[in-house]
Amino acid sequence: MATALSEEELDNEDYYSLLNVRREASSEELKAAYRRLCMLYHPDKHRDPELKSQAERLFNLVHQAYEVLSDPQTRAIYDIYGKRGLEMEGWEVVERRRTPAEIREEFERLQREREERRLQQRTNPKGTISVGVDATDLFDRYDEEYEDVSGSSFPQIEINKMHISQSIEAPLTATDTAILSGSLSTQNGNGGGSINFALRRVTSAKGWGELEFGAGDLQGPLFGLKLFRNLTPRCFVTTNCALQFSSRGIRPGLTTVLARNLDKNTVGYLQWRWGIQSAMNTSIVRDTKTSHFTVALQLGIPHSFALISYQHKFQDDDQTRVKGSLKAGFFGTVVEYGAERKISRHSVLGAAVSVGVPQGVSLKVKLNRASQTYFFPIHLTDQLLPSAMFYATVGPLVVYFAMHRLIIKPYLRAQKEKELEKQRESAATDVLQKKQEAESAVRLMQESVRRIIEAEESRMGLIIVNAWYGKFVNDKSRKSEKVKVIDVTVPLQCLVKDSKLILTEASKAGLPGFYDPCVGEEKNLKVLYQFRGVLHQVMVLDSEALRIPKQSHRIDTDG
């Protein structure tokens, strides 16, 4: 199965893999690995001009890796940000002997400065499209005396309301942001719209303020003020003041929310709303890696209710979530259950069934695509009909699994293969260069490998008979795919010391004499070796550690 190909996979040298040391290697381990490779690649050991040139280039690369990893500061930068972090401008002004945490903060500061130039042109578009569907005719049929009316034999499904909203942000300075938003709504043939403009200023690291002006065709001008402030590291408060002008006069409104972190995963909220729909609300929200739990109680005019909801988060690649809630108040009782799942890199599809009195049964379908939301509330019936509940539950599941198998999965697979092929084409030059470097390294190893084999044979030690690296395919696959495996017998034999071979938990593509023959795909290392005159065989994943010889690798020839 193909894996995502990152830029770092193409641009960054793995210095740990090059030296074949652990990421936690001590200075002594680094020095020993450096000396061994220096003896192998030192230009003075080769007389042939071509080999001497190749050795000089590899020697410089090994020296660069050792220089980076032997210095605590550059090593910390490399561990956190890779080779690109070392190339970031501004490190020359950083004081020496900083901790990794301080280096991380400094890097982020430099990165923010670089991004400020792009800030002026950056927006944060957000949009919502809601389409209300009246499908009650599917379940709430008229009496038989009306069935003779022309066209009544087919249920009528209507769109009875729509809502569209959009907003964009325009950063003016590092602390000021302008926000423009608008919305249009229509219900049963009547509609209206509004437009709002807001200016937000970050006053300090602890707070910000926002001024808002709005106008619409159904309501008069709106003036608002929002304030946010961190009172303590665990407590914050927000206040929203609004003045709504209409033909009936001025309608003031005030909303204040006080929140406090009760523990690492739990937040308590206390909300007071005065003026427009006055109410007092308190809630506790607990959010963990595997669950999201909410309990709330509201006393207000005209609505008072109690709410409890729970959401379970599955730890799968599709980020599947199932949820359920119970809401009871003066308006009635509503039970809601549903699920959502990631269907692509930027899209999440969800569906929920709402069953309540006196609302009836509704199906709510929601699609989040990046920062855009598409919402489809479908009203099925005003009554509590088991048939409506059944179809609202089973219908979306059947449609989803059918679409996922017949449309979504094939489309994503085709897109992934297309993207992978494009990445392979763009990486072709880099792969060719890595291949030439690996071949040069193998030529430089020949003399050392000959001496190692002689020493190992004299004591019946470790001899690498054959070694292959890359993507292994079965016999049914196309023969052309077999070129994705390369012979790495010589490079592995060169790493043998005292009848032992130890490879760390890093991609083998960075080892001397190796290269990546199948960029972006899963790879394995297969080794056939001889120890004490007995054949052994082992296969490991690309980033899996390997230590040979081992008794468990022995090939049983008795049977």
From Swiss-Prot:
Domain of life: Eukaryota
UniProt cross-references to Gene3D superfamilies, sorted A to Z: DnaJ domain
Location(s) in or outside the cell: Mitochondrion
Coiled coil region boundaries: 417-457
Entry keywords, A to Z: Acetylation, Chaperone, Coiled coil, Membrane, Mitochondrion, Mitochondrion outer membrane, Phosphoprotein
Modified residues (Phosphoserine): S204
Chain ranges of the J domain: 14-82
Keyword Membrane: yes
N-acetylalanine PTM sites in chain numbering: A2
GO biological process terms held by the UniProt record: cristae formation; inner mitochondrial membrane organization
GO cellular component term of the entry, any: mitochondrial outer membrane
Family: Belongs to the DNAJC11 family.
Subunit (UniProt): Associates with the mitochondrial contact site and cristae organizing system (MICOS) complex, composed of at least MICOS10/MIC10, CHCHD3/MIC19, CHCHD6/MIC25, APOOL/MIC27, IMMT/MIC60, APOO/MIC23/MIC26 and QIL1/MIC13. This complex was also known under the names MINOS or MitOS complex. The MICOS complex associates with mitochondrial outer membrane proteins SAMM50, MTX1 and MTX2 (together described as components of the mitochondrial outer membrane sorting assembly machinery (SAM) complex) and DNAJC11, mitochondrial inner membrane protein TMEM11 and with HSPA9.
Descriptive protein name: DnaJ homolog subfamily C member 11
